[in-house]
Amino acid sequence: MLKLILENIVTAPERLGLPAAYAESDVLLYRQYGRYDAVAVQREGKQLLKRAEALQADYDIATLPRLAKQYTEWRKKLQQLKFKRLLHGEFAAGKGITLYANAIRQECAEHGWDYAAYYDSVLVHERVHLLHYQAVLAHFSAAGAAVQSAEYKQAQCYWYGRQTEAAQAAVVKETLAEFARWLWCLQQGQHSMAQAFLQTPEEARTCIPHYPYAGVRGLCALHVSSPQAVVRAYSELWQLSLTSWQQAYERIKQLNAAK
């Protein structure tokens, strides 16, 4: 399945049942990730340090457990700091794919990457989203169904995730799409580009589900150790995602923990 996607998704999307057409826009859009403001978290860290120094000076051992708990909670916030990321492409159910050309140009100019290769890598990512969406429609017998049909509404509800599942659904979607993009870059010889996807400081620090793209790290690590195993893991995630975002998300967490 993964091989079929990578061989056709740019040059022959029709073989995957995908339309070749997509929209292009010159607007610059940013998407915010994380939960906590960096300045506020830094301020909280300084306050904790002062309390620790005061505790050491006064030998107030009784307050140590509470301070330790506060420090643990503060450290968790370091993995959820807010940051913005320039949007390069977008897939929206019912609207299709949009690629943001100026954003792609800006990214390539900043890093010295080949524009055509980076453009196609974004297209890979968004087309995997579209392919995934079509698979969900098919699973709910909603492919070609009327918008007002019960099957279509059920598929739409599932695709976006039901309330608390929304963040988990986003992680699963981005993991499947971004890993395909990362592997496509490797196969095209764009090694520096693929490596950079995992090394942006803010992105490397922020964890799932607050940064859904972080889920790809486990699959990338597995590919390095066993390319055959990662193909099986990818197919497993894809199948799980059609019935349970939660189960697919838990599998991604396991892969990330093992990396």
Predicted regions span which residues?
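Glycine-centered structural positions embedded in regular secondary structure
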Residues: 82, 88-90, 128, 175, ...
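An active-site-proximal "capping" alpha-helix that borders the catalytic cofactor pocket
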Residues: 170-186
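A metal-dependent hydrolase signature that marks the N-terminal structural subdomain at the beginning
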Residues: 1-115, 239-247
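Pan-zinc metallopeptidase signature
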Residues: 185-259
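Post-HEXXH active-site segment of zinc metalloproteases
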Residues: 117, 133-175
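Active-site recognition of the HExxH zinc-binding catalytic motif
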Residues: 121-137, 178
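Residue-level detector of short, conserved catalytic/binding motifs and their immediate flanks
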Residues: 95, 118-122, 175
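Residue-level recognition of hydrophobic positions within alpha-helical transmembrane segments
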Residues: 22, 56, 122-125, 170, ...
